[in-house]
């Protein structure tokens, strides 16, 4: 039985690395939807960055939002999910996302970007659906 599980995990990891499996969406974020999100380092939403995302888990890699990254859910329970991501440019990060309401979440993120460490907390609020013709990130 252990050999079968090991083989399945090895095959799954290989296919995932090759981009043949779609990313699994965290259950903790299921009540939230993609769309326009205002993201700020301030709890009151001061000076937000507005991003259009297909799913909220993309906000886990906010520091690398314009990079090609792969995300792996490493913990997912209740209203909290932990996501590790690795980017093609060598950057990486780990984010703990907590769903406050279906339209509000926090992201505690840390990692390496441009060869330097980063660590900060983000507050994200869903503002609505993305407008037609605007690229999603």
Language model: regions and residue ranges:
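Positively charged n-region of N-terminal signal peptides that target proteins for export
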Residues: 1-6
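Bacterial N-terminal signal peptides
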Residues: 8-19
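N-terminal helix-cap/turn-to-beta initiation motif at the start of protein domains
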Residues: 23-34, 75, 128-136
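Tryptophan-anchored aromatic micro-motifs
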Residues: 32-47
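Short beta-strand segments that buttress and anchor functional surface loops
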Residues: 37-41, 81-88, 97, 107-113
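Central antiparallel beta-sheet cores of small beta-barrel/beta-sandwich binding domains
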Residues: 45-102
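Short, surface-exposed coil-to-beta transition loops
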Residues: 90-95, 106, 117-121
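Edge beta-strand at a domain terminus
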Residues: 114-137
């Amino acid at each position: 039985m252990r050999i079968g599980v090991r083989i399945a995990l090895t095959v799954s990891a290989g296919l995932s690395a090759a981009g043949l499996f779609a990313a699994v969406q965290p259950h903790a974020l299921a009540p939230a939807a993609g769309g326009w999100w205002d993201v700020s380092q301030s709890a009151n939403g001061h000076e937000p960055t507005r991003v259009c995302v297909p799913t909220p888990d993309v906000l886990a890699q906010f520091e690398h939002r314009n990079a090609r990254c792969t995300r792996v859910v490493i913990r997912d329970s209740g209203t909290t999910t932990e996501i590790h991501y690795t980017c093609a440019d060598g950057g990486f990060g780990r984010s703990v996302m907590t769903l406050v309401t279906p339209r509000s979440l926090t992201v505690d993120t840390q990692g390496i970007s441009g060869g330097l460490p980063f660590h900060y907390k983000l507050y994200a609020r869903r503002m609505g659906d993305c407008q037609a013709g605007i690229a999603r990130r």
